[in-house]
């Protein structure tokens, strides 16, 4: 088979297994497939895997650090690893294109390499983590949905974020409340900065705005 797919909502909902081995022909882990599998500690990600669905591993105690996602994987769904409280390190493949809303929020991830080729980062994708530094690749100019990019990585630890050239807008609430943020570049291509994009960044002492910037939001 190719899919570990949901069945009436959740395939392995609250499953009581510690380790799972997926066969090499699995291409998709479906929505809520391992939702709150509260005893799950370890599983393999086959090289055939192309997508991880929404809420696939929501609130599971995965203890694979680093969590190595395979080359060939292109999409991580919304809330896929949200509330995985034991997760402290993730290695993304060079093939990843999309990271969904809150995909890694409320984890203990302290570092992540976002590869060139990544095209989209969802709303609160790294909210409430332990990230200290983030570099957004030049290929990634699309942030979030609805409240675009709000609280992209709101946490107590983020100190530095590097934004890509070609970015035209810093969205609403982008790094709002990142109280330890000391350094952020604003690319010369930025035209608009949204409301509360940098609100409550109390450790940020210096900013350079591009000459061509057209609007600066409130807060």
Where are the regions a protein language model picked out?
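Short, charged, surface-exposed secondary-structure boundary motifs
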Residues: 144-146
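Consensus positions within tandem repeat domains that build extended binding/scaffold surfaces
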Residues: 10, 30-33, 53-56, 77-80, ...
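Structural signature of tandem-repeat unit edges
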Residues: 1-2, 13-28, 38-51, 62-75, ...
């Amino acid at each position: 088979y190719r899919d570990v797919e949901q069945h009436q909502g959740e395939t392995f909902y609250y499953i009581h297994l510690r380790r799972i081995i997926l066969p090499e022909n699995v291409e998709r882990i479906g929505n809520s497939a391992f939702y709150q599998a509260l005893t799950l500690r370890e599983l393999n990600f086959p090289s055939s895997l192309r997508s991880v669905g929404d809420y696939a591993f929501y609130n599971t105690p995965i203890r694979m650090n680093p969590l190595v996602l395979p080359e060939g994987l292109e999409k991580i769904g919304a809330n896929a690893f949200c509330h995985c409280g034991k997760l402290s390190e993730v290695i993304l493949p060079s093939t990843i294109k999309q990271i969904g809303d809150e995909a890694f929020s409320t984890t203990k991830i302290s570092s992540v390499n976002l590869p060139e080729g990544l095209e989209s980062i969802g709303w609160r994708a790294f909210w409430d983590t332990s990230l200290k530094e983030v570099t957004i690749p030049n290929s990634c100019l699309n942030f979030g949905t609805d409240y675009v990019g709000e609280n992209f990585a709101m946490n107590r630890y983020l100190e530095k974020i590097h934004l890509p050239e070609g970015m035209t807008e810093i969205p609403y609430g982008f790094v709002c409340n990142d109280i330890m943020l000391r350094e952020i570049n604003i690319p010369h291509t930025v035209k608009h900065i949204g409301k509360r994009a940098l609100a409550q960044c109390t450790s940020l002492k210096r900013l350079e705005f591009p000459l061509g910037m057209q609007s600066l939001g409130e807060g």
